[in-house]
Amino acid sequence: TARLYAQGCCMYGQDFSERMVQLAQEKMPDAKLYSGDFKQGLVEPLRAQRYDFILATYSLHHLTDAEKVLFLNGLLALLKEDGEILIGDVAFRTRVELEACKTQAGASWDEDEIYFVADELAPAFPQLKFVPFSACAGILSLRR
């Protein structure tokens, strides 16, 4: 996001960590950044905006699949016409791929995280696209 900011993009953001918000604000002094838990949704100032793009990187795997659906539907409503949500995270196309990665990871697998499985979100979001960029991560996109 700092690169986008450097190119003149207006940046808005939310993180549950006050410290992360503080560090980001130091790098992007004109950005509108807020502290808040995604499980409670976006803070009011962010809900009042409309966006060309919404980016989420390695943050939404803390939500259950049901919470992801609710949260993403809320984000879709905040997009401008032809806006897009881009999510970079630990993600898989299928449950089989996730289970294979979990087996390979063994004890280092984080059981507390709820990683994205694109095929399982597709019924809620027929427009969902998934592009893998490693064996255990990818970009999910939703366009309005």
Q: Each predicted region: which residue ranges?
A:
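A conserved beta-strand element that flanks and buttresses the S-adenosyl-L-methionine
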Residues: 55
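Short catalytic micro-motifs in class I SAM-dependent methyltransferases
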Residues: 58-62
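Short N-terminal helix/helix-N-cap motif within the alpha/beta-hydrolase-1
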Residues: 64-68, 95
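An acidic, carboxylate-rich microenvironment
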Residues: 67-70, 120
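A short glycine-rich, Lys/Arg-flanked "PGG" loop and its adjoining helix->strand segment in the class I
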Residues: 69-81
